[in-house]
């Protein structure tokens, strides 16, 4: 997908860029049976208190039900019926029509087009968009939508432009290099989809104006130094101040490089190399 720029008729359009939707199927509303209503919580938890700040408002959305698993469709070919926009994620989605008549959405890989035939299973051909166990994917291939637990469905590499690379296979585990630089062992029976995720230009768009952030449900971010002492550790002082201490969160936890990962996690033994800083 290309990037669309605007003539600066107003100051808010000067730096605004959006994605052009030329690659998407024309005139396709989301399949009603694969959508459901999405209730926005405005960052509140079950007790009504703010648990995630700066959330609220935004345009209404229908949630698209995505098949991250594809295990129950092993060896059943599916035709790509359309490639559609999904407001709930950065990647586009593809509508598959299986040979048995069932329809499902998957994350759209880079390079597939309407009419392509995809398949999942241990014996599926090595082709972009096909889902196979990691042990059946050749070393050096890029993959996405990777399972961490057999049968749970893909959890890693699901956003636009994302991919991981198969580096090695030894015993029951396959070494995978994630796009962050982290190298990780994943059980060889876990499923991954071959190829990169499409819509890679998503990372290059410029919002351009505050109003678009509001359309997306993002509210303004107030600096701690602009608050009162009761609201933030950086608050208060006479006139403009620097905060007077090393940067911390509103609850006093150090920020900007402070490691928050627990020292002893069960998954540490699967991480060969931590992500790049």
UniProtKB/Swiss-Prot annotation:
One of the record's GO molecular function terms: rRNA binding
PROSITE patterns: RIBOSOMAL_L2
Biological process according to GO: cytoplasmic translation
Any one of the GO CC terms: large ribosomal subunit
Region (Disordered): 32-58, 225-277
SMART domains: Ribosomal_L2 (SM01383), Ribosomal_L2_C (SM01382)
Applied use: One of 8 loci used for multilocus sequence typing (MLST) in Borrelia burgdorferi.
Record's function text: One of the primary rRNA binding proteins. Required for association of the 30S and 50S subunits to form the 70S ribosome, for tRNA binding and peptide bond formation. It has been suggested to have peptidyltransferase activity; this is somewhat controversial. Makes several contacts with the 16S rRNA in the 70S ribosome.
NCBIfam families associated with the record: rplB_bact
Protein name: Large ribosomal subunit protein uL2
Higher taxonomy: Bacteria, Pseudomonadati, Spirochaetota, Spirochaetia, Spirochaetales
Gene transcribed to yield this protein: rplB
